[in-house]
Amino acid sequence: MRITQGCFSFLPDLTDEQISAQVDYCLGRGWAVSLEHTDDPHPRNTYWEMWGMPMFDLRDPKGVMIELDECRKAWPGRYIRINAFDSTRGFETVTMSFIVNRPEVEPSLRMERTEVDGRSIRYTHSIVR
């Protein structure tokens, strides 16, 4: 099952040229760019592992692409995403996030419904590999 999280998730995978163009768009607006990776794509897993430090002073997308290549080499079977942060108001806000690397075989999410007290429904999600 294809995981759909972030911008462009319903489109085919972006090429490196398209990724570079999106990073250039982010940098042109003064947003800081960072890379994160995970092997657990569960929607509630919002805290992925950071790859390096956020690139606050970067002006050229080549720096991000070099870091992305290194991250892909280190974690070829993981999800990798690019985040862009806007800190113009004194606090960091994610303005853009998109997946740039996926494992060859993506896991599926299974949802189980359980009726509990008072006819309430409890939902449990698990990953099926």
From Swiss-Prot:
Similarity remark: Belongs to the RuBisCO small chain family.
Other comment: The basic functional RuBisCO is composed of a large chain homodimer in a 'head-to-tail' conformation. In form I RuBisCO this homodimer is arranged in a barrel-like tetramer with the small subunits forming a tetrameric 'cap' on each end of the 'barrel'.
Protein name: Ribulose bisphosphate carboxylase small subunit
CDD domains: RuBisCO_small (cd03527)
Keywords, sorted A to Z: Calvin cycle, Carbon dioxide fixation, Photosynthesis
Name of the encoding gene: cbbS
One Pfam family recorded for the sequence: RuBisCO_small
Induction, as annotated: Expression of this form I ribulose-bisphosphate carboxylase operon predominates when carbon dioxide is limiting.
GO process annotations (BP): reductive pentose-phosphate cycle
Task performed by this protein: RuBisCO catalyzes two reactions: the carboxylation of D-ribulose 1,5-bisphosphate, the primary event in carbon dioxide fixation, as well as the oxidative fragmentation of the pentose substrate. Both reactions occur simultaneously and in competition at the same active site. Although the small subunit is not catalytic it is essential for maximal activity.
GO molecular function: ribulose-bisphosphate carboxylase activity
InterPro entries found in the cross-reference section: RuBisCO_ssu, RuBisCO_ssu_dom, RuBisCO_ssu_sf
Species per Swiss-Prot/TrEMBL record: Cereibacter sphaeroides (Rhodobacter sphaeroides)
HAMAP family recorded: RuBisCO_S_bact
Residues passing through the membrane, by range: none
Matches recorded under SUPFAM superfamilies: RuBisCO, small subunit
Keyword Disulfide bond: no
PANTHER family: RIBULOSE BISPHOSPHATE CARBOXYLASE SMALL CHAIN 1, CHLOROPLASTIC, RIBULOSE BISPHOSPHATE CARBOXYLASE SMALL SUBUNIT
Domain of life: Bacteria
Assembly with partners or alone: Heterohexadecamer of 8 large and 8 small subunits.
